[in-house]
């Protein structure tokens, strides 16, 4: 499965089975975690049993069940691009999980941050978590949620400001962004294409917009075949 196919196949799953993740798959996932931590200076951790962050928590409103394995997305508080990096590298890890027939879901607020799932240093910030594991077939509730989300994807014309006809690579990138998860499916990222230069920006709402920004960038780069400069208004470099 390619990354593009993983983007097409990914769904945000909330109901997990107790089936453990195989050792060989965990090894592959950990190799990517190590590589991305080194590249980004993040401190992503895989937690085999993070169920305490969800067990008996009213904040999850019953949407999450059977959560066990987690990616804990954390990094240095002083990192100006922390949340963007978390979104970017976290989504790359999600896609690797999808390619191994696992499922995942971004969780920013519906978990117990006071649970002792991981020990952080004073200089680190826990941004969010990503449950990972095996799931049953889509439940009726999940199908309804996915149908509602799919029907609310932001139209490309509302994502893009451009003074020319949209080139094919840009269109493909934006289509991939439409499939990117975001808080309440808000899809806050704005792309501007002027004088042959593409830039991406987002309003920093102090919550999860910058995480969504990183997720959107990862999807765009895979489909658009290039790389964004880090930060708001970073330019896209076509490869």
Locate each region found by the language model.
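Acidic, surface-exposed loops and disordered segments
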Residues: 1-239
């Amino acid at each position: 499965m390619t990354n593009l196919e993983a983007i097409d196949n990914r769904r945000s799953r909330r109901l997990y089975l107790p089936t453990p993740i195989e050792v060989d798959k965990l090894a592959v996932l950990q190799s990517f975690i190590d590589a991305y931590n080194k590249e980004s200076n993040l401190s992503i951790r895989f937690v085999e049993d993070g169920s305490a962050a969800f067990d008996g928590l009213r904040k999850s409103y019953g949407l999450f069940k059977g959560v066990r394995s987690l990616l804990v997305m954390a990094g240095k508080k002083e990192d100006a691009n922390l949340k963007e990096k978390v979104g970017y590298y976290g989504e790359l890890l999600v896609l690797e999980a999808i390619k191994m027939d696992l499922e995942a879901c971004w969780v920013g607020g519906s978990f117990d941050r006071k649970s002792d799932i991981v020990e952080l240093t004073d200089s680190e910030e826990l941004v969010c978590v990503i449950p990972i594991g095996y799931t049953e077939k889509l439940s009726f509730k999940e199908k309804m949620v996915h149908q509602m989300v799919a029907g609310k994807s932001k139209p490309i014309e509302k994502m893009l400001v451009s003074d020319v006809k949209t080139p094919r690579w840009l269109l493909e990138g934006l289509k991939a962004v439409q499939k990117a998860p975001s808080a309440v499916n808000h899809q806050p990222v704005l792309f501007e294409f002027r004088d042959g230069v593409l830039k991406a920006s987002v309003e920093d709402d102090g919550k999860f917009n910058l995480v969504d920004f990183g997720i959107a960038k990862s999807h765009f780069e895979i489909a658009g075949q290039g790389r964004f400069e880090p930060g708001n208004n970073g330019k896209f470099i076509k490869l």
